[in-house]
Protein backbone atom coordinates (compact mmCIF):
# COMPACT_ATOMS: atom_id res chain seq x y z
CA UNK A 1 0.00 0.00 0.00
CA UNK A 2 2.78 2.44 0.92
CA UNK A 3 4.56 1.76 -2.37
CA UNK A 4 1.36 2.30 -4.35
CA UNK A 5 0.62 5.52 -2.49
CA UNK A 6 4.15 6.78 -3.14
CA UNK A 7 3.79 6.07 -6.85
CA UNK A 8 0.45 7.87 -7.00
CA UNK A 9 1.86 10.90 -5.20
CA UNK A 10 4.88 10.91 -7.50
CA UNK A 11 2.63 10.99 -10.55
CA UNK A 12 0.59 13.76 -9.00
CA UNK A 13 3.74 15.83 -8.57
CA UNK A 14 4.77 15.16 -12.17
CA UNK A 15 7.78 12.97 -11.50
CA UNK A 16 8.57 9.31 -11.09
CA UNK A 17 9.96 8.35 -7.69
CA UNK A 18 13.32 6.63 -7.91
CA UNK A 19 14.52 4.22 -5.26
CA UNK A 20 18.01 4.65 -3.86
CA UNK A 21 20.73 2.22 -4.93
CA UNK A 22 20.94 -0.96 -2.88
CA UNK A 23 23.99 -0.38 -0.62
CA UNK A 24 24.88 -4.07 -0.37
CA UNK A 25 25.14 -4.22 -4.16
CA UNK A 26 27.67 -1.38 -4.22
CA UNK A 27 31.10 -2.22 -2.91
CA UNK A 28 32.94 0.59 -1.16
CA UNK A 29 36.50 0.54 -2.61
CA UNK A 30 39.27 -0.72 -0.36
CA UNK A 31 41.34 1.98 1.29
CA UNK A 32 44.92 2.00 0.02
CA UNK A 33 46.33 3.69 3.13
CA UNK A 34 45.85 3.81 6.88
CA UNK A 35 44.16 7.09 7.87
CA UNK A 36 45.80 9.05 10.70
CA UNK A 37 44.38 8.63 14.18
CA UNK A 38 41.58 11.00 15.23
CA UNK A 39 42.90 14.12 16.94
CA UNK A 40 46.44 13.70 15.57
CA UNK A 41 45.79 16.38 12.94
CA UNK A 42 43.73 19.52 12.43
CA UNK A 43 41.09 20.20 9.81
CA UNK A 44 41.28 23.85 8.78
CA UNK A 45 38.23 25.99 8.12
CA UNK A 46 37.66 26.19 4.37
CA UNK A 47 34.53 28.31 4.04
CA UNK A 48 31.16 29.04 5.57
CA UNK A 49 28.35 26.92 4.19
CA UNK A 50 25.79 28.97 2.24
CA UNK A 51 22.17 29.34 3.26
CA UNK A 52 18.92 29.36 1.34
CA UNK A 53 15.39 28.01 1.20
CA UNK A 54 15.06 24.24 0.89
CA UNK A 55 12.28 21.67 0.90
CA UNK A 56 12.28 18.76 3.33
CA UNK A 57 11.13 15.39 2.04
CA UNK A 58 7.78 16.01 3.76
CA UNK A 59 7.32 19.14 1.62
CA UNK A 60 7.93 21.67 4.41
CA UNK A 61 9.93 24.84 3.69
CA UNK A 62 13.07 25.23 5.79
CA UNK A 63 16.36 27.09 5.76
CA UNK A 64 19.43 25.12 4.77
CA UNK A 65 21.25 26.45 7.85
CA UNK A 66 18.92 24.34 10.01
CA UNK A 67 20.65 21.30 8.52
CA UNK A 68 24.25 22.58 8.50
CA UNK A 69 24.65 23.87 12.05
CA UNK A 70 24.34 22.41 15.54
CA UNK A 71 25.94 19.06 14.68
CA UNK A 72 28.81 17.70 12.65
CA UNK A 73 27.30 17.23 9.20
CA UNK A 74 28.18 15.28 6.08
CA UNK A 75 26.54 17.11 3.17
CA UNK A 76 26.38 16.13 -0.48
CA UNK A 77 24.54 17.02 -3.68
CA UNK A 78 22.92 14.15 -5.57
CA UNK A 79 20.23 13.44 -8.10
CA UNK A 80 17.97 10.43 -7.80
CA UNK A 81 18.46 9.02 -11.30
CA UNK A 82 22.28 9.11 -11.25
CA UNK A 83 23.75 5.81 -12.44
CA UNK A 84 27.48 6.62 -12.43
CA UNK A 85 29.02 4.02 -10.07
CA UNK A 86 31.64 6.59 -9.03
CA UNK A 87 29.04 9.29 -8.43
CA UNK A 88 25.89 9.50 -6.33
CA UNK A 89 25.53 5.71 -5.80
CA UNK A 90 29.06 5.59 -4.34
CA UNK A 91 28.25 8.46 -1.98
CA UNK A 92 25.06 6.71 -0.87
CA UNK A 93 26.83 3.39 -0.24
CA UNK A 94 29.67 5.07 1.67
CA UNK A 95 27.33 7.06 3.90
CA UNK A 96 25.10 4.03 4.47
CA UNK A 97 28.11 2.04 5.69
CA UNK A 98 29.30 4.89 7.90
CA UNK A 99 25.81 5.41 9.34
CA UNK A 100 25.79 1.91 10.76
CA UNK A 101 29.20 2.42 12.38
CA UNK A 102 28.16 5.73 13.96
CA UNK A 103 24.95 4.23 15.32
CA UNK A 104 26.98 1.48 16.99
CA UNK A 105 29.32 4.03 18.62
CA UNK A 106 27.76 5.47 21.80
CA UNK A 107 30.10 8.48 21.93
CA UNK A 108 28.87 9.66 18.51
CA UNK A 109 25.13 9.25 18.97
CA UNK A 110 23.17 12.46 18.51
CA UNK A 111 26.23 14.41 17.35
CA UNK A 112 26.24 13.70 13.61
CA UNK A 113 23.76 14.09 10.76
CA UNK A 114 23.78 13.37 7.03
CA UNK A 115 22.20 15.63 4.40
CA UNK A 116 21.71 14.75 0.73
CA UNK A 117 20.34 17.54 -1.48
CA UNK A 118 19.20 17.31 -5.09
CA UNK A 119 20.82 19.01 -8.07
CA UNK A 120 17.54 18.76 -9.97
CA UNK A 121 14.45 20.27 -8.31
CA UNK A 122 12.37 19.84 -11.46
CA UNK A 123 12.40 16.05 -11.18
CA UNK A 124 13.50 15.47 -7.60
CA UNK A 125 10.40 16.65 -5.76
CA UNK A 126 9.99 16.02 -2.02
CA UNK A 127 8.06 12.84 -2.90
CA UNK A 128 10.91 11.64 -5.12
CA UNK A 129 13.50 12.42 -2.46
CA UNK A 130 11.48 10.59 0.19
CA UNK A 131 11.21 7.57 -2.09
CA UNK A 132 14.95 7.71 -2.85
CA UNK A 133 15.82 7.95 0.84
CA UNK A 134 13.60 5.02 1.76
CA UNK A 135 14.18 3.79 5.29
CA UNK A 136 17.13 6.17 5.65
CA UNK A 137 14.77 9.15 5.29
CA UNK A 138 12.57 8.06 8.18
CA UNK A 139 13.79 9.43 11.49
CA UNK A 140 14.27 6.83 14.18
CA UNK A 141 16.52 6.34 17.15
CA UNK A 142 19.65 6.38 15.02
CA UNK A 143 21.50 8.96 12.97
CA UNK A 144 19.10 11.21 11.04
CA UNK A 145 19.65 11.45 7.29
CA UNK A 146 17.82 14.30 5.54
CA UNK A 147 16.94 14.27 1.84
CA UNK A 148 16.34 17.82 0.62
CA UNK A 149 15.41 19.56 -2.59
CA UNK A 150 14.45 23.11 -3.60
CA UNK A 151 11.47 24.77 -5.23
CA UNK A 152 13.34 25.66 -8.41
CA UNK A 153 16.77 26.01 -10.01
CA UNK A 154 16.85 29.74 -9.32
CA UNK A 155 16.81 29.16 -5.56
CA UNK A 156 19.24 26.26 -5.86
CA UNK A 157 21.90 28.14 -7.86
CA UNK A 158 23.30 30.34 -5.03
CA UNK A 159 23.72 27.30 -2.80
CA UNK A 160 25.57 25.38 -5.52
CA UNK A 161 27.81 28.39 -6.05
CA UNK A 162 28.35 28.83 -2.31
CA UNK A 163 29.56 25.26 -1.98
CA UNK A 164 31.64 25.49 -5.16
CA UNK A 165 29.73 22.60 -6.69
CA UNK A 166 29.62 22.63 -10.50
CA UNK A 167 26.98 20.77 -12.47
CA UNK A 168 26.10 20.80 -16.15
CA UNK A 169 23.80 19.02 -18.57
CA UNK A 170 26.03 16.44 -20.23
CA UNK A 171 23.54 15.31 -22.85
CA UNK A 172 20.04 15.86 -24.07
CA UNK A 173 17.15 13.73 -22.95
CA UNK A 174 18.11 10.13 -23.81
CA UNK A 175 15.40 7.86 -25.23
CA UNK A 176 13.27 6.40 -22.47
CA UNK A 177 14.53 8.77 -19.77
CA UNK A 178 12.57 11.58 -18.18
CA UNK A 179 15.55 13.79 -17.45
CA UNK A 180 18.88 14.75 -19.04
CA UNK A 181 22.11 13.35 -17.67
CA UNK A 182 23.76 15.72 -15.21
CA UNK A 183 27.55 15.91 -15.22
CA UNK A 184 29.20 16.75 -11.91
CA UNK A 185 32.27 16.03 -9.83
CA UNK A 186 31.34 14.04 -6.74
CA UNK A 187 31.94 16.06 -3.59
CA UNK A 188 30.99 15.33 0.01
CA UNK A 189 31.41 18.16 2.50
CA UNK A 190 32.25 17.80 6.19
CA UNK A 191 30.85 20.66 8.28
CA UNK A 192 31.46 21.46 11.92
CA UNK A 193 28.70 22.48 14.31
CA UNK A 194 29.15 26.13 13.39
CA UNK A 195 28.38 25.50 9.73
CA UNK A 196 31.99 25.79 8.55
CA UNK A 197 33.21 23.43 5.82
CA UNK A 198 36.27 21.64 7.20
CA UNK A 199 36.92 19.02 4.51
CA UNK A 200 35.78 18.24 0.97
CA UNK A 201 36.00 14.65 -0.24
CA UNK A 202 36.19 13.51 -3.84
CA UNK A 203 36.05 9.92 -5.05
CA UNK A 204 39.67 9.18 -4.09
CA UNK A 205 39.18 10.08 -0.42
CA UNK A 206 35.57 9.04 0.09
CA UNK A 207 35.81 6.10 2.46
CA UNK A 208 33.98 5.35 5.73
CA UNK A 209 37.22 5.03 7.72
CA UNK A 210 38.48 8.45 6.55
CA UNK A 211 35.15 10.13 7.22
CA UNK A 212 34.84 8.54 10.65
CA UNK A 213 38.27 9.70 11.81
CA UNK A 214 37.62 13.22 10.55
CA UNK A 215 34.29 13.34 12.39
CA UNK A 216 35.98 12.20 15.59
CA UNK A 217 38.70 14.81 15.09
CA UNK A 218 36.13 17.61 14.87
CA UNK A 219 34.30 16.36 17.95
CA UNK A 220 37.54 16.41 19.93
CA UNK A 221 38.01 20.12 19.31
CA UNK A 222 37.45 22.37 22.34
CA UNK A 223 34.40 24.61 22.20
CA UNK A 224 35.22 28.24 21.28
CA UNK A 225 35.80 30.40 24.35
CA UNK A 226 33.03 32.74 25.36
CA UNK A 227 30.59 31.11 23.02
CA UNK A 228 27.65 29.09 24.24
CA UNK A 229 25.97 26.63 21.94
CA UNK A 230 22.24 26.88 22.40
CA UNK A 231 20.22 24.31 20.49
CA UNK A 232 16.54 25.03 20.02
CA UNK A 233 14.02 22.23 19.91
CA UNK A 234 13.95 22.62 16.12
CA UNK A 235 17.70 22.13 15.80
CA UNK A 236 17.86 19.19 18.17
CA UNK A 237 15.34 17.37 16.03
CA UNK A 238 17.80 17.23 13.14
Residue spans of the language-model regions?
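N-terminal targeting signals for export/organelle localization
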Residues: 1-51, 55, 233-238
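A local structural motif
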Residues: 46, 140-145, 170-176
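Sec/Tat-exported extracytoplasmic proteins
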Residues: 47, 71, 78-81, 86, ...
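Extracytoplasmic
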Residues: 47-49, 67-74, 109-114, 124, ...
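Short active-site neighborhood of thiol/selenol oxidoreductases, capturing the structured segment around
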Residues: 64-94, 114
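Structural microenvironment flanking redox-active thiols in thiol-disulfide oxidoreductases
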Residues: 90-159
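Thiol-/selenol-based redox modules, centered on thioredoxin-like
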Residues: 161-238
Amino acid sequence: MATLLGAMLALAFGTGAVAAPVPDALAVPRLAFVPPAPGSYRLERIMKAPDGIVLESDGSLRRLSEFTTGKVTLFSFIYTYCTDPKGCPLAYATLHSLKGTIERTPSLRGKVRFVSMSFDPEYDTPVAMRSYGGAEARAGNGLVWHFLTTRNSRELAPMLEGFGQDVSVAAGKPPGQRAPVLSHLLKVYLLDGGGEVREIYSTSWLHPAVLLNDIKTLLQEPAPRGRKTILTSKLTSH
